[in-house]
Amino acid sequence: MQLCQKEKCTSCGACTVSCPKNAIYFETNEYGFCYPRIDDAKCVDCGLCRKSCHVLNELNGNIPQKAYAVWSSDSEDRKTSTSGGAASVFYNEVLKNKGICYGAVYDSDLKVVIKGYDDNNILKFKNSKYVHSKMGSTFLDIKNQLKDGYEVIFIGLPCQVAALRTYLKIDFRNLILVDIICHGTPPQVYLDEHIHYFENKKSRKADEIRFRQDNEFYFSLKSSNTVKPFVSMHKNLDTYLLSFFEALTYYDSCYDCKYACNERVSDITIGDFWGLGLKEPFKHGYSGAVSVVLINTKKGVSFFDRVKNKCCLLYTSPSPRDPKTSRMPSSA
């Protein structure tokens, strides 16, 4: 059995979860990138891995119907958000309906994994994470919860949303899919090595990591028994962030990402609204971080209607990328 080409693989893990014989496992290459391998002794050529692969199965995307600049009406929520707090508003709406929320979190070893919560642990979803995240058992867990009737929201990278859609094969009415405007992802080992370098240099143990500070990009590490970080490096001085923003350390698939386009594979797309006020005056008396929210499907429209009263929002029309309002380098 042949999986997709390695340079196109996003390391989502759908193939491993779909295999009934546990014949697929992940292997890390010499550069720290993880890719699936098939144990030929266990494989029975059933083809379920290929049917669950979003690279091998084309998905229809949707042009955003509406675009908004959004920030949470809750000032305390905004203080703990690295953007405008749109994701937090979405999570709280699902929790209110006894639903389950999925997103990327740091575990106790500062490794990024996708987790699901049905309580106020959603605080763990906050904080930017500029690294690849492992899905683990997320595919199977979400499938079972959807079948049990729970409302589920999944917020992840476009390739992870596409992977979940392909794995499920059914458009569950109780599933809200939200993708993040992505810049590309380095493997976890690069971040691990960067953290360990500073831990050894400073003789400190890092318990908390941050990539944002006052709406600027900083690499910060903090111990649990201290107030101030023992490392705080601006992105122009930090090798991890510098290589991230210069697009030097991503998975191969990121450099030819088929989801980096106007057509979105999710119900809703969120990200940072860079450049707000540069084209037209922003007269709302608010100077904090702002989220961009793109509504892509009828389900997205319906869900966003449920949370509008918890946001301050400004309607803008979806438009092509403008280099003057972008903080990210273009691949064009």
Please state what every model-predicted region is.
Residues 178-194:
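Short, flexible loop segments at boundaries between secondary-structure elements
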Residues 127-172, 187:
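Intrinsically disordered, low-complexity linker/loop segments enriched in Gly/Pro
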Residues 327-332:
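Hydrophobic alpha-helical segments, chiefly the membrane-spanning helices
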Residues 41-148, 317:
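Flanking helices and flexible, charged tails adjoining ferredoxin-like Fe-S electron-transfer domains
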Residues 202-297, 301, 311:
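A conserved active-site cap/scaffold subdomain adjacent to cofactor or substrate pockets
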Residues 170-180:
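A short alpha->loop->secondary-structure connector
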Residues 8, 14-31, 35-37, 47-64, ...:
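Iron-sulfur cluster-binding cysteine motifs and their immediate structural context
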Residues 315-324:
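Conserved small/polar residues in nucleotide/adenosyl-binding loops
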